[in-house]
């Protein structure tokens, strides 16, 4: 089971607060509406979406990860990437005020295992 330290919580909360501030800007709703129009085949300006970014080459602002647990490390890295992209190369990206968390499943091993039999009954 992953234990999140107090320092990791502080780091993630600080980054999440910054992300939420950027995501609350009205430009994101405007960009989302433009993407909907484009996907609905309406005429809008050409939209720019950048998704192939060499993150490992961009320096300490995006690559200085302060958390150590695997779950926090992934979340911090993703939030830093979103903030960096918004600050320096936003294109027509839409920041949403949500953080997607992976599903965490812990198997205790105390479950009922299926009894499998082959065609001969063994």
Mark where each language-model region is.
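Catalytic cores of TIM-barrel enzymes
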Residues: 1-122
């Amino acid at each position: 089971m992953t234990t999140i330290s107090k320092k990791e919580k502080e780091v993630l909360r600080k980054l999440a607060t910054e992300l939420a501030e950027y995501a609350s800007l009205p430009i994101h709703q405007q960009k989302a509406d433009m993407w909907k129009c484009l996907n609905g085949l309406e005429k809008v300006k050409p939209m720019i979406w950048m998704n192939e970014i060499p993150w490992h080459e961009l320096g300490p602002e995006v690559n200085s990860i302060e958390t150590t647990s695997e779950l926090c490390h992934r979340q911090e890295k993703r939030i830093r990437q979103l903030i960096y992209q918004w600050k320096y190369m936003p294109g027509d990206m839409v920041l949403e005020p949500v953080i997607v968390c992976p599903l965490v499943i812990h198997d205790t091993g105390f479950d009922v295992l299926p009894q499998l039999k082959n065609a001969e009954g063994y």
